[in-house]
Regions:
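Glycan-processing catalytic domains of CAZymes
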Residues: 33-261
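Intrinsically disordered, low-complexity regions
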Residues: 1, 12-14, 45, 91
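N-terminal export signals
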Residues: 5-27
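Generic detector of short, well-ordered, non-transmembrane alpha-helical segments enriched
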Residues: 2-3, 170
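C-terminal segment of N-terminal export signals and the immediately downstream linker at the start
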Residues: 1, 21-38
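Short, cationic motifs built from Arg/Lys/His that form the positively charged side of catalytic pockets
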Residues: 3-4, 202
């Protein structure tokens, strides 16, 4: 079996996180392969140019040499296995951008503008992107939420990104990547961070759909206080992380936590 076919079948045999009904359009390949109407195919995933230096390993080294054509081919490959939505994890790493910017020198990559390369490819093949607005500080999510200096740079970057890239048809919205841990609730700093960032995003791109991805639902308490927090947050999509991939939750247990949610 070809690698792409294996990935396609693997994805269609998994259970996706529930997202708004407007986002449940199923590609033709998925419709053909998914015979169980109760199981919704996975139609979105993560995307990144580089991971953190501590964990990136061979991944970072390989992607650092990608040409614009290789990025284009990668986006098309992802679309071919049934993905319709991609969440770009970062437009910068440790304060240096992956795109041409006036804020700081660009991280050396195999093409001049990887962000333009992937968004242009997504326009061609019909993928929608949630575009990140970080990482302009260290990887401590709470520090980045609270640091006003980082917020200033973040907003400058969003202005640049909106000016350079929001004309793309695939620019569906923003991803705010400073992920809050639910222990068992959102901290107040996270609520403020989300609302301030969303307000700025909506001024730049009024039709944007914005997404956050808090973790881990294993420790969350879904009660009236949690609901009140959600009611305060100006956010369109919350993509809850189960933590299976980082061994925080077992695959077998994840279903019951989503059921509680």
């Amino acid at each position: 079996m070809r690698r792409r076919d294996f990935i396609r079948y693997l994805g269609l045999g998994s259970v996706a996180v529930t997202i708004p009904e407007a986002m449940h359009a199923v590609p033709a390949a998925a419709t053909t392969l998914c015979s169980d109407k109760k199981t919704k195919p996975i139609s979105g995933s993560w995307f990144e140019f580089q991971h953190s230096a501590a964990e990136g390993g061979y991944w970072n080294e390989a992607l650092a040499h990608f040409t614009a054509d290789q990025w284009r081919r990668k986006v098309f490959e992802i679309r071919e296995v049934g993905m319709e939505y991609l969440v770009l994890m970062g437009v910068a790493r440790a304060g240096k951008p992956f795109y041409p910017s006036k804020i700081a020198p660009r991280i050396p990559m195999g093409c001049d503008d990887p962000l333009e390369a992937v968004l242009s490819a997504a326009d061609e093949c019909g993928i929608k992107f949630f575009v990140s607005n970080d990482f302009w500080g260290d990887l401590d999510a709470y520090n980045m939420m609270l640091d006003k200096g980082v917020q200033t740079v973040r907003f400058q970057a969003m202005e640049e990104i909106a000016e350079r890239y929001s004309h793309h048809a695939c620019f569906y919205g923003w991803y705010f990547p400073n992920e809050a841990m639910l222990q068992p609730y959102f901290v107040d700093a996270c609520v403020n961070y989300v609302n301030e960032t969303a307000a700025f995003a909506q001024r730049l791109t009024p039709n944007c759909v914005n997404l956050i991805a808090p973790y881990f639902i294993k420790e969350a308490r879904f009660d009236d206080h949690f609901v009140r927090q959600l009611e305060k947050m100006n956010i369109d999509i919350i993509a809850y992380q189960d933590g299976v991939g980082v061994n925080h939750t077992s695959l077998e247990d994840s279903a019951k936590f989503y059921e509680k949610l």
